[in-house]
Curated annotation (Swiss-Prot):
Transmembrane annotation, as ranges: 11-31, 106-126, 132-152, 161-181, 185-205, 231-251, 257-277
Gene that produces this protein: fimP
Lipid bilayer topology: Multi-pass membrane protein
Pfam families: A24_N_bact, Peptidase_A24
EC numbers: 3.4.23.43, 2.1.1.-
Name of this chain's protein: Prepilin leader peptidase/N-methyltransferase
Gene3D superfamilies named in the record: 1.20.120.1220
Note on cofactor: Zinc is required for the N-terminal methylation of the mature pilin, but not for signal peptide cleavage.
Length: 286
């Protein structure tokens, strides 16, 4: 009860935002390292197929590389990032977006992820005051942020993020946090099969692939958290966001944008404002 009351005060919201800044810093590690880890695993697997299970690909560095080790370094000069240089937001601004070792530019994405994580977490904290609901909702939000940026940069929606998010949604439903267990499981199934069907229909007609399997899994995750009845709203919202991007930024850049980020954004908006969006589209009665 005391925690619930604290979460409704400005001080509680402030602490959520402050903690989320640190989470945003970790999400930057996830966004950078998970694709590298996947690439190394694929190279090692391909090498073992041709050279035996006990062989080691010489292109892969021998040093351990995961989300915890080694310590963060500048990708340009290898300068080790000191603790004082790793303070969320402040360090990037103090260093003026440059490495203290070589002066190379540090991507503004690091600053954006930290600020975005804090901002979205504060919004979530305004919606959910119950500690259990808030905890689940924050993890949902943080995972979508990581997936959004990874897919935008690498056209990847890693199983090591989508599958835990799917099971976490089902776990939340087991305790009736957002929806019940039956709705969660059915939602996951329908969410996956809907895009899977579109994928194969498009491929049969055109002979080309219109999206990746990661999109199926991401939509399954979103529906596991919200139920199958939110599927039309999520897809329609994602399509609108994609069209806005294509007509605006996409045409100028001449670069295709994966569907995952639009699904993630639409899924998060629907998670918090699904009823309002549904009324706007006439899906739910006002």
């Amino acid at each position: 009860m005391l925690i619930s009351e604290l979460l409704q005060t400005p001080l509680g919201i402030f602490f959520v935002g402050l903690f989320s800044l640190m989470v945003g810093s970790f999400l930057n590690v996830v966004i950078y390292r998970v694709p590298v880890m996947m690439d190394r695993e694929e190279k090692q697997y391909a090498w073992q197929v041709f050279h035996g299970e006990d062989s080691v690909c010489p292109e892969i560095p021998k040093q351990r590389f995961n989300l915890l080790v080694p310590a963060s370094r500048c990708p340009h000069c290898g300068h080790r990032i000191r603790a004082i240089e790793n303070i969320p937001v402040i360090s990037w601004l103090f260093l003026k977006g440059k490495c203290s070792g070589c002066g190379a530019a540090i991507s503004a994405r690091y600053l954006l992820v930290e600020l975005l994580t804090a901002a979205l977490s504060v919004i979530v904290a305004f919606h959910y005051h119950d500690p259990l609901s808030l905890g689940f909702a924050l993890v949902f939000t943080w995972t979508l942020i990581a997936l959004c940026f990874i897919d935008a940069e690498h056209q990847l929606l890693p199983d090591r993020l989508t599958l835990p998010l799917l099971w976490l949604g089902i776990l939340a439903a087991l305790f009736n946090v957002f929806i019940n267990l039956e709705s969660s499981v059915i939602g996951a199934m329908i969410g996956y099969l809907s895009l899977w069907s579109v994928y194969w229909l498009f491929k049969l007609i055109t002979g080309r692939e219109g999206m990746g399997y990661g999109d199926f899994k991401l939509l399954a995750c979103l529906c596991a958290w919200q139920g199958a009845w939110m599927l039309p709203i999520i897809l329609f919202s994602a399509a609108i966001l994609g069209m806005i991007y294509a007509l605006g930024i996409g045409l100028r850049m001449g670069k295709p944008m994966p569907f995952g980020p639009f699904l993630a954004i639409a899924g998060w908006l629907t998670f918090l404002y699904g009823a309002q969006i549904g009324q706007l589209f006439g899906y739910f009665p006002a």
